[in-house]
Amino acid sequence: MIESILILSKTGIIRFIKIYSSNDENLNKSELVNNILINIQKSEDTQIIYDFPYINNEKRKLVYKSFGGIYLILIIDECENELASLDFINVIMKVLDEIFKGVCEIHMIMNPDKLYFLIDEMICGGMVIETNKEDIIKNYNDKMKFDDVNYKYFSK
């Protein structure tokens, strides 16, 4: 199960965070981000960190990938496959890249609603439900058309 998904700038600023674990009331986000950045800096050669201390020092796996000025990070439990998680990170970035025509940090800042919609199309309750890029983009485009029609109708 995916416990959390984060998008951080290289300087450690949270651009997106979604937590799927049920005991997140004990989560200190700034401490989590500091812990993530320290572990990423220590592990320059790998994109998978085992025994990552998560909520209440429970051990999880941290899988991340760097894209330009951002880190896309998944915190997963022991049952989740690390290589599948890395592949899923690539799917997320391909979808974001197609939607935003070359995704960068400013897109995360200016379009959080679109970002949450796209992530929710792919993950539900910590489980990956969709990895087909074309289906995700089609659903996104359908939603944008629907929102545009509603805006035109209700703004009269």
Where do the model's predicted regions map?
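Acidic, low-complexity cytosolic segments
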Residues: 1-156
